[in-house]
């Protein structure tokens, strides 16, 4: 069940996910501490409520855009000069001592430290083990989280572009209908804030996992994933009360102002024998944008 090819694997429970503390640090700028509890009221509210059974959907999750791509590194070989050029005088060159190094462009670095509730962490790992032991021997919570991150970036971009037809096989029909009404009523800036570039996702957390059976004996797994991401969308600060705003230094040039937003995506899959192993998104919530 290569998660990368089909997307993710699954769960959900209902305990509060305590607000982890995130520290953002950039070269040449002041260190900023952000408390995720203060910016993710939506996630805290959802995780603190009791888990109610969610309608089952059988939409397929097969988009090739969700496959994970391995990073590639270019290899630079050594340049060899032809023999005819060996006799030519060497062109003047400048050497650098340890005290005089060629000036290099600074790169923005960010260090994220997140701390989850240890009880919630242990519980989700136990449920992940049960999924592996009884439902899917190829299931891995680490691979699922990575696939969920890619799915979040892909789906949020389509949402911001109002390409709802491309989401029909990824999002539950009832959920998609509600999203159409909410997203189309947003301003352009708020629509842009929905999109999360995968490089701007600073923290991912497994919020909840649930395993349950319906009255017909069908087996279902729900996994709630919480994401925190940066956006440079031009949104008035008063429209996002409680959101953290800070500056990111881009090398040695300009300074860009970004906001830290949160979103919750719930993934669902039916594990009944004979049913296709497809994942679907059963709930989408963007704190302060889609409420």
UniProtKB/Swiss-Prot annotation:
* Organelle transit peptide: 1-96
- Give me the Gene Ontology terms describing cellular component: mitochondrial matrix
The yes or no answer to whether the keyword Coiled coil is present is no
Assign the protein's first listed, main location to one coarse class: mitochondrion
Q: Which UniProt keywords apply?
A: Mitochondrion, Transit peptide
Localization (cell)? Mitochondrion matrix
Q: Does the keyword Iron apply?
A: no
GO-annotated biological processes? calcium import into the mitochondrion; mitochondrial calcium ion homeostasis; protein insertion into mitochondrial membrane
Function comment: Promotes sorting of SMDT1/EMRE in mitochondria by ensuring its maturation. Interacts with the transit peptide region of SMDT1/EMRE precursor protein in the mitochondrial matrix, leading to protect it against protein degradation by YME1L1, thereby ensuring SMDT1/EMRE maturation by the mitochondrial processing peptidase (PMPCA and PMPCB).
User: How does this protein assemble?
Assistant: Interacts with AFG3L2. Interacts with SPG7. Interacts with SMDT1/EMRE (via the N-terminal transit peptide); interaction is direct and takes place before maturation of SMDT1/EMRE.
| Protein known as | m-AAA protease-interacting protein 1, mitochondrial
Recite the lineage of the species: Eukaryota, Metazoa, Chordata, Craniata, Vertebrata
Q: Which gene encodes it?
A: Maip1
């Amino acid at each position: 069940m290569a998660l990368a090819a089909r997307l993710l694997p699954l769960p959900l429970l209902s305990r509060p996910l305590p607000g982890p503390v995130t520290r953002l640090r950039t070269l040449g700028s002041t260190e900023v501490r952000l408390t995720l509890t203060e910016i993710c009221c939506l996630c805290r509210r959802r995780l603190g409520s009791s888990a109610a059974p969610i309608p089952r959907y059988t939409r397929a999750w097969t988009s090739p855009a969700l496959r994970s791509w391995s990073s590639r590194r270019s290899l630079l070989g050594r340049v060899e000069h032809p023999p005819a050029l060996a006799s030519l005088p060497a062109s003047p060159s400048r050497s650098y001592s340890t005290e005089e190094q060629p000036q290099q462009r600074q790169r923005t670095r960010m260090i994220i430290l997140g701390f989850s509730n240890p009880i919630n962490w242990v519980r989700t790992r136990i449920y992940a083990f049960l999924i592996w032991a009884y439902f899917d021997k190829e299931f891995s919570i680490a691979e699922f989280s990575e696939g969920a991150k890619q799915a979040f970036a892909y789906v949020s971009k389509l949402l911001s572009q109002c390409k709802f037809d491309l989401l029909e096989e990824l999002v539950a029909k009832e959920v998609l209908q509600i999203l159409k009404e909410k997203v189309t009523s947003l301003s352009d800036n708020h629509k842009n804030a929905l999109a999360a570039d995968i490089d701007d996702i600073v923290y991912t957390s497994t919020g909840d996992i649930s395993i349950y059976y319906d009255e017909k004996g069908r087996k279902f797994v729900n996994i709630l994933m919480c994401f925190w991401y940066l956006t440079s969308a031009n949104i008035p600060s008063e429209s996002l009360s409680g959101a953290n705003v800070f500056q990111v230094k881009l090398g040695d040039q300009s300074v860009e102002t970004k906001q830290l937003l949160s979103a919750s995506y719930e993934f669902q899959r039916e594990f009944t024998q004979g049913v296709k192993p497809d994942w679907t998104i059963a709930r989408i919530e963007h704190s302060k944008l889609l409420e």
